[in-house]
Amino acid sequence: MTEATQAQPAVPRLTSLSHGGGCGCKIAPGVLSELLKRATPPALFPDLLVGTETSDDAAVYRLNDEQAIVATTDFFMPIVDDPFDFGRIAATNALSDVYAMGGKPILALALVGMPINVLPHETIAAVLRGGESVCADAGIPVAGGHSIDSVEPIYGLAAIGVVHPSRVKRNAAARAGDVLVLGKPLGVGVLSAALKKNQLDADGYAQMVATTTKLNRPGAELAALPGVHALTDVTGFGLLGHTLELARGAQLTARVHYASLPWLAGVETFVADGVFTGASGRNWAAYGTDIRLADGLPPVAQALLTDPQTSGGLLVACVPEAVDDVLACFRADGFDRAAVIGEMADGPARVDVA
């Protein structure tokens, strides 16, 4: 064979180079909680409005009476094999934490770890372009970053945003009687597991990418609505984990209505066939003692409710009178599956699902 006709080495699948993918590769919540016990007490910094104390989505630091900085970082290993899509998903997921605090992103820095001698440079460049495309859609620059030669592919962003100090929305401020509204359908982790097992068809892949690359832009507008008390996004700890954070922060019981939950197409069938992530079980092991699942729920309920979401939806706690405005805010930005999924009530800090 001539040099021109020699077979070129196959480019490995991105997902084959990592032991986990997306937010499913987070450190288990119980382990993370133990590690963070040694964090510096936030009381030493009076302008630090939000730190690590309630496992909120981002740090918030007050600059003056009119402006605060929202700072967050998020990165993970590939959840898909297409490098451009991987970059888009990772960037969308990172920016979500700014929106979840009620903030508006202004700047991002890229965080890149790649097996530089394994992946073609054009593959790595496509990941970066994917992230830049999302940031351009959000109206912000990728102004720099940091890179290392890594055994497993890693990509994400450090994101900076701004918010008025009075409009910061924490995950610990829900009140009894608040209604819970979820912005995106659930099941991303299940679809990613199906993809890794070569069981996800083109339509399933398309819906997974569509939901994970949709910016949670309504966050800032939601934060400005009267009657919106708390805001977070549903990511690696699953719907139950992030709802439990709301419950613990407010010392209330969160009630979730299973029949009202929006699901991505096909996820219930996949779980029934045994296709779901290992992170689902780790999530349940970490917080299952504070969950009450009613009798009569489908056998797949536990795995679905703990399914790790990558770039998941915003979860809003608001007064009943604000629900129509919250849903209108979501739908004006194309979140057609936004739904009322439960409410907060007096009671022990736990989640009840019925």
Swiss-Prot record:
The record marks 26 as: Important for catalytic activity. CDD domains: SelD. It comes from the Bacteria. The keyword Transferase applies. Its cofactor is Mg(2+). GO terms for molecular function: ATP binding; magnesium ion binding; selenide, water dikinase activity. The active site is at residue 23. Binds 1 Mg(2+) ion per monomer. GO terms for biological process: selenocysteine biosynthetic process. Its EC number is 2.7.9.3. GO terms for cellular component: cytoplasm. Transmembrane segments: none annotated. Homodimer. Belongs to the selenophosphate synthase 1 family. Class I subfamily. This is Selenide, water dikinase.
